[in-house]
Amino acid sequence: MIQLKLTFIYVLVAGVLSAQNFKAGAIGGISTSQVSGDQLGGFNKVGVKLGSFVNHPINSATRGELAMYYIDKGSNDLNSNFRIDLSYIETSWSIQKTSKGFIYEGGLLFSILVDGKTYDIYGYEDITKGDFNKIDIGAKLAAGIKLKPKLLMFWEITNSLPFTPFQDHPGGASYGLNKGKYNSILSFSLRYLYSK
């Protein structure tokens, strides 16, 4: 029995060590975001998305990808100085499928809050509304195209999952799946592969 386990571990480790198909690259782009639950509408908060990724082929048309990047999220009222500024370090675990010249991607996100502030309608920081949850868990869908052999362009939509708001409603009020405020992001990014 022990020999069987050791053989299994050896085969598994040998397979991983012989896998030289990993590809790494850089991500750079723009994020536009809104907050569900702040009584505002529109993706009016503009920010940056910067980081890196590594992917590995599963088969000829499918890849698994792990990415880590900095991203700005939050909300911005165009009629006043009210805004929510959130900065995250985010990891993305996704599966990519290539079909008819397009790359389709779906996956999960895990974000750690780096900095978060709320500003009132006059532009002053409102420290009474700075009680943000440190973790935001979400899901994403994306579509992309290959511009050049080492350059990809992606459009992505992400949203916090219903049970993980980044901020609770005042007084802890809850309405079904609506437990608080949630991030919704539309982003555009370029992904550059370091090697083909």
Protein language model regions, located:
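Residues that define the transmembrane beta-barrel architecture of outer-membrane proteins
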Residues: 42-48, 85-89, 98-100, 133-139, ...
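Short glycine/proline- and aromatic-enriched beta-strand/turn motifs that initiate or cap beta-hairpins
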Residues: 19-55, 191-196
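Repeated loop/turn-to-beta-strand initiation elements of outer-membrane beta-barrel proteins
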Residues: 22-23, 60-64, 101-104, 149-153
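Transmembrane beta-strands of outer-membrane beta-barrel pores
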Residues: 30-34, 68-74, 97-99, 110-114, ...
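Predominantly the C-terminal beta-signal and adjacent terminal strand-loop region
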Residues: 76-77, 139-141, 146-196
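Outer-membrane beta-barrel strand-turn architecture
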Residues: 56-60, 95-101, 147-149, 194-196
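Outer-membrane beta-barrel translocator domains and adjoining extracellular loop/strand segments
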Residues: 36-42, 76-82, 116-123, 165-172
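Glycine- and aromatic-enriched membrane insertion/assembly motifs of diderm outer-membrane
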Residues: 41-89
